Amino acid sequence: GTFDHFEKDAVVMTGGERVTADMAILAIGWELGIPFLPDSYQKKLVDPDGQYRLYRLIANPDLPDMGFVGFNSSFCTVLNAEMAANWLARYADGQLARQPSTEDMRRNIEMMLHWRRNERPAAGVYGGLCVAPFHFKHFDELLDDMGAKVRRRGALTEKFTPPDADAFARYLASVPDYRVQ
């Protein structure tokens, strides 16, 4: 069968087969959606207008055991996913240099939803998950949260040039060392 739903330690297929798993990776391509999640999760994650309730476009404080890497639209998808994966590993283990409280996350989500709906409604096509053309701001927030010591220089120049993956590798390397336990 195909994927039907999650259980505590397994993925259950449509034919009833249980596949034991420590992790499940969703690779949806370009069609946005998470139809396999229970309605109770959907209601916490997606507003009626299709906007996703995600802090840093990665995590929802009301679904603490779930996070999304590469779920948001970007012109530099691989770099975006790499930054998000590093952020999510630290967030999930409570190891961000600036670990947000649940209330801080909710306030930020509300502020960003208001901004997207009122200032950038065109991004609604992407569930509000498009960081283009705001890559640098998004990456700066993730790096700040992780405690990066090396930061961008010449931000004005960078705004008019493509993202430099090598530079972001240096910024990420300046984050306090952390290995998932």
Model-inferred region functions:
Residues 111-112:
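Extended repeat-based interaction scaffolds and adjacent low-complexity, acidic/S/T/P-biased segments
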Residues 1-101, 120-181:
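Flavin (primarily FAD) cofactor-binding/catalytic cores of flavoenzymes
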Residues 115-117:
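Activation targets extended, charge/polar-rich intrinsically disordered C-terminal tails
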Residues 100-108:
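Short catalytic/ligand-gating loop segments at beta-alpha or beta-beta junctions
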